[in-house]
């Protein structure tokens, strides 16, 4: 249906609730949720380009609750990392630890919002047909679209919590600056509140160069995936893996070779070069550092000490956090449980800190709308 002449939203419930006497079955998480598409017409990007129709896909769990004044009090948005999807969070290791019965963000009492960002999942992306004619979107465009999805599409006027992993963590910082009174709390995971610089930026440039400098890319108009995508995926593997866990998983030369071969085959089979390129280049405008004082909601930033993307020796969070009025930084030590950059998707390790953040919110340290 049309909504105010500029957007439409359609929904199809996949499976609202799957219950047993013991609660939600772990194997059923992949079937849970209501999926919807929100269409934004004539969407203007920061670089001046316009997309006639921008499709934003979202999965939701639970229902919004409103107070006597009509403000939504239980909505939580979870923002995915580069190349991820909202439904990627619906796993036993993530959803089972946070959204299940009795958990901190139980979907029976919370309205969980899991968007697919621009360029990923079932949202509009280059591989839909435009290829390299697709607008060169940036994080600022993604956050703008997320806000419109939540406010115009889902009719949510306030968020209990904004949280995200990796790219989603970076966008969480941006949410806190751009919409400071819109949320009660912020949880950026595996990110830093500084400019896209140093090795992180270099890795992204190497990914971009591997694809753009490959003659098979053909300016984005390839028919088969260019071989440059192979080198780009190799960079991603090295940056996001955990040396400790890789040695445990592959303690010999042969097992190491087999492991990385399987990893590459799996990722190459499901990745489009243009989508991958755009996803990494989207970070080009990221730098929340000038506006950290604008963040007024309680913020808890969590990184792990074995994260090669945001290595702890840089000390960026420690230097920046004093500028955040209600900010706190936690660095999780390396252990048999951590998984490098991927620790962001293992709430069993860090959800105790989330509980502390929610306690702070309940005590009323957040912004007053």
Q: Where are the regions that the model predicts?
A:
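Conserved acidic catalytic loop of the alpha/beta-hydrolase fold
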Residues: 140-160
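Catalytic active-site module of serine/aspartate enzymes centered on a nucleophile-bearing elbow/loop
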Residues: 327-369
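Alpha/beta-hydrolase-fold enzymes
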Residues: 182-266
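N-terminal cap/lid subdomain of alpha/beta-hydrolase-fold enzymes
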Residues: 59-128, 316
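Conserved hydrolase catalytic core segment
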Residues: 159-162, 166-197
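Short beta-strand/loop motif that positions the catalytic acidic residue
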Residues: 295, 301-303
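Conserved alpha/beta-hydrolase "acid-adjacent" motif
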Residues: 308-314
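Catalytic-loop region of hydrolases
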Residues: 26-75, 86-88, 365-369
């Amino acid at each position: 249906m049309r909504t105010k002449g500029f957007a439409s939203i359609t929904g199809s419930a996949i499976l609202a609730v799957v219950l047993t006497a013991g609660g939600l079955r772990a194997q059923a998480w992949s079937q849970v949720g209501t999926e919807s598409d929100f269409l934004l017409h004539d969407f203007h990007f920061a670089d001046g380009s316009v997309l006639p129709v921008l499709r934003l896909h979202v999965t939701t769990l639970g229902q919004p609750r409103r107070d006597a004044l009509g403000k939504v009090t239980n909505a939580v948005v979870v923002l995915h990392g580069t190349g991820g999807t909202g439904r990627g969070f619906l796993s036993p290791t993530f959803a089972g630890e946070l959204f299940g019965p009795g958990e901190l963000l139980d979907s029976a009492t919370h309205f969980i919002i899991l968007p697919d960002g621009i360029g990923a999942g079932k949202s509009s992306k280059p591989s839909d047909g435009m290829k390299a004619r697709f607008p060169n979107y940036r994080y600022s465009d993604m956050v703008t679209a997320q806000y419109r999805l939540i406010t115009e599409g889902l009719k949510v006027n306030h968020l209990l919590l904004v949280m995200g992993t990796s790219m989603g963590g970076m966008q969480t910082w941006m949410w806190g600056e751009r919409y400071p009174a819109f949320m009660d709390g912020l949880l950026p995971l595996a990110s830093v509140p500084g400019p896209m610089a140093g090795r992180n930026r270099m890795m992204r440039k190497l990914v971009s160069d591997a694809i753009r400098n490959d003659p098979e890319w053909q300016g984005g108009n390839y028919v088969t995936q260019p071989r440059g995508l192979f080198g780009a995926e190799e960079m991603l593997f090295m940056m996001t893996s955990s040396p400790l866990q890789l040695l445990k998983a592959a303690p010999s030369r042969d097992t190491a070779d087999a492991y990385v071969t399987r990893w590459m085959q799996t990722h190459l089979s499901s990745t489009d070069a243009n989508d991958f390129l755009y996803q990494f280049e989207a970070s080009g405008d990221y730098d929340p550092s000038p506006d950290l004082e604008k963040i007024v909601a309680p913020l808890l930033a969590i990184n792990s000490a074995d994260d090669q993307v945001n290595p702890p020796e840089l000390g960026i969070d420690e230097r920046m956090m004093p500028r955040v009025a209600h900010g706190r930084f936690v660095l999780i030590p390396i252990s048999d449980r951590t998984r490098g950059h991927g620790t962001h998707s293992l709430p069993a390790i860090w959800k105790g800190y989330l509980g502390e953040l929610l306690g702070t919110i309940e005590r009323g340290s957040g912004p007053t709308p």
